[in-house]
Amino acid sequence: MTSHRILFATDLPFWRRSTGAEQRIARLVEYLSQSGYCVRIFLLCETTELNQDNSIITEKDQQTIRAQNLDIEFKRSSHPPRQLSKKAAWHLKAIKHHFGSNRTQQHQTSPAQPASQNESLETATPTTLADYRWPWAIDAFADSIRSFAPDSVIIEYVKLSYLLEALTASQRKKIHCLLDTHDVLHLRNKQFQERGLVHWLDISQVEETQAVQLFDTILAIQNEEADVFRNLAPKQNVLVCGHAPLQLPPLKIQPTTSEILTVGYIASANASNLQSLTNFINQSWKPISQRCKIRLVIAGMICDAISTSSPDLFKEHSNIARLGCVSELADFYHQIDVAINPVAFGTGLKIKNCEAIFFGKPLVTTTIGMDGFSAESSESLMVCNSPEDWVDCLVEIAQNPSRQTSLQQAAAKLSQTGFSDQEVYSELDNALRHKK
């Protein structure tokens, strides 16, 4: 019997694992391949000068792809979708401009305006679904369907839903089409807009509803969002597929011996992360540092973003260290005692929170950061929703080594049970094996 063939469509270099989304996609592909599925990646990538670090496939990329035995069908073009180059460049400027303005000016400059007065209104328009339509991609996807003959198609993010136009009516009857959503994007977009921030995709509820209803099966990243998608698409099969980091051997918890508590934050450079970390440092870090021996280690692309938006912030706090991007997550987590995520808004499942527990690190986060976690997770998590909460919580942990050890033990236990492949991927595996 031939193995089930999956054509997996994305425009993210997920093997780099440089963001939470890439971490999750990489692990999903890994799980499917190890479970006997034949997986081919249909990868849209741009070869213009825009974001060269993200769009150009380097020798290091090739080495990683070979090492992971990934079957990737590269679809390159020097002609990106309509206006995407201009808009993506503006998006990055707008984020930096917004936070820089908030820190240096009494008034708040509207982030809905371009960073430069010389930029046109067209340039300042946020990206939409239409901007992600690569003009040649439908034909390319049709070619891949014919040559690979998949049993299932998994498309990453609603922005690529238009690729289903490549399937003929006959193919749609035979091929199981799944959408991996990552977020309820119209709700996430609304949350950003309410705070005067730029979201990477300007999408309405109507647009997202129309897109998700094109699919047979919708993958929600957590239970609450599954309920949202069931309301948006009552005729579609909606299931939950979260994130299962590659399992480590059982963690050995050593009693803490350092007098200094090291807390850590790792993140990409999106506006939610940038605002959350900046507010935490500005509102809570000084009083925390005055009451206990503590240091903060920051890693990921957030380091460059916060250095650009708030260049003096690190000069004001000698007990904050920046690692930048790390090649392995373990390089970060082995340096810290406790992970923090002061996220104030957002949707989906906070991948950084899953990873903290996975590495056996106690997690301090907000109510928003708890989205997608079960009640059983509470022994290894602490919730803070105000600057005062953050001060009291971290001071308590720093001054109470036995409390830190008990939190670590609970996190280590949860890491072995709460994120198993069986728990995370069983619904997807069942749908793939029995749907169509």
Language-model segments: which ranges?
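Conserved nucleotide-sugar donor-binding subdomain of glycosyltransferases
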Residues: K86-Y162, E194-V212
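Active-site proximal beta-strand in glycosyltransferases
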Residues: S152-V153, Q171-K190
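Donor nucleotide-sugar binding/catalytic pocket of nucleotide-sugar-dependent glycosyltransferases
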Residues: T209, Q213-P250
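Conserved catalytic-core segment of nucleotide-activated headgroup transferases in glycan assembly
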Residues: V240-D312, R322, V326-A330
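Acidic donor-binding loop of glycosyltransferase active sites
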Residues: N319, D331-G348, F359-K361
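Short hydrophobic beta-strand element within catalytic cores of glycosyltransferases
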Residues: K352-E355, P362-T366
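Conserved acidic donor-binding segment of nucleotide-sugar-dependent glycosyltransferases
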Residues: L381-E388, E396-P401
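A charged, aromatic-enriched C-terminal amphipathic alpha-helix characteristic of glycosyltransferases
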Residues: S402-L432
